[in-house]
């Protein structure tokens, strides 16, 4: 009697489905604040001295709002910043942009606060403390702006990842890090 041996071949198939739901980047001047909730603003105000920095982080580095990933600092050693405008990345003066970024977000906090201060009276003291600290002490404001600079540098990979995914979605050929990751030598030439 002969024994029949069956050889079975296993075939593994891997499917990778990458879904990118990336919107077109907003121009820096058209940054969208509409996704922010009352809770987001309250968390910012609760950070007292750092509330503008906290708002900037929520607006420009929120993974749920990649279209606002439109500003970052590529190199901490110089005075330049990258800003997305008119479908391109532009090199700008860092100090001027930090001042504008701070002022824009400070204004957004003040407008929100004016609208909701009666609803959240317990935050009146915190917000007034913030305004007084910033108004009365230039050193506090300088420290907050230094923290904003560090945040824009430390979170640059979020912006780079968004840009890379956006380029993949539109079929553009990319290799490695497509955002201008400029070296110190490049910045010295600018």
What residues fall within each predicted segment?
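Extended amphipathic coiled-coil helices
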Residues: 1-190
């Amino acid at each position: 009697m002969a024994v029949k041996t069956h050889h079975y071949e296993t075939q593994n198939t891997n499917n990778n489905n990458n879904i990118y739901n990336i919107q077109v980047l907003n121009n820096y001047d058209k940054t969208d604040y509409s996704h922010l909730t009352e809770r987001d603003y309250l968390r910012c105000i609760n950070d007292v001295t750092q509330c503008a920095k906290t708002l900037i982080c929520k607006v420009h580095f929120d993974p749920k709002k990649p279209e606002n990933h439109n500003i970052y600092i590529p190199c901490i050693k110089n005075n330049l910043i990258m800003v997305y405008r008119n479908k391109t990345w532009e090199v700008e003066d860092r100090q001027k942009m930090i001042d504008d970024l701070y002022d824009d977000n400070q204004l957004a906090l003040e407008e929100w606060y004016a609208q909701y201060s009666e609803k959240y009276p317990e935050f009146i003291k915190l917000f007034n403390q913030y305004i007084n600290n910033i108004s009365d002490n230039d050193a506090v404001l300088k420290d907050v702006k230094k923290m904003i600079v560090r945040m824009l540098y430390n979170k640059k990979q979020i912006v780079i990842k968004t840009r890379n995914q956006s380029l993949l979605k539109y079929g553009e050929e990319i290799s490695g890090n497509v955002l201008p990751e400029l070296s110190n030598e490049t910045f010295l030439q600018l």
